[in-house]
Amino acid sequence: MYPERFSHLPEYAFPRLRALLDGHKFSGPQYNMTIGEPQHLYPLWIKDVLLDHLDGFNRYPANDGIEKLQISIVDWFYKRFGVVLSSDKNILPVNGTREGLYNVSMALCPDKLSDSQPFVLIPNPFYQVYMISALSVNSEPLFISTDEQSGHLPDYFGLKADILNKTSAAYICSPSNPQGAVATVDYLTALIELAE
């Protein structure tokens, strides 16, 4: 039995697609299109490294992640972007993007904003978890088309003030998926200014 707030959630997209395809006969080669699942064997040396480091795999990791991993992530951000981060305040390893994106909505989206249901801005095409996380926190997903004219990034700048004032979150993906457009520093700066 699920809480009432989850009763209106749609079925995830990939099982819906599977149901549409089931029962159809196909000729020719078939390909496993499982999303995000590696399709190739890992290099053999990885097996040796894993076997050499099995100690500790019988316990759950710390809630905040493995400290050595967090420090490595902080170091990478500094080397790559010159950004100074704190491993205990800015880094939280998650089991995958779905978990992290969903939990961000759960943590940041209020029940009401300006006495009404908040919006969550979502670029379209979109990653299914954007919509599901918005619906899970009783927010209204507002899909913003991304096309050649917008540089394949969402144009949140043209939205009316009454929508922006009721917006609790806005998703941005750079590079955009599936188009691969990369947000510029100017775009991201303008987006932060819009949010403020």
Segments and roles (model prediction):
Residues M1-S7:
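Generic N-terminal amphipathic, Lys/Arg-enriched alpha-helix
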Residues S7-E99, N103:
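N-terminal small-domain helix-loop-helix segment of the aminotransferase-like
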Residues N58-E196:
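Conserved core of the PLP fold type I
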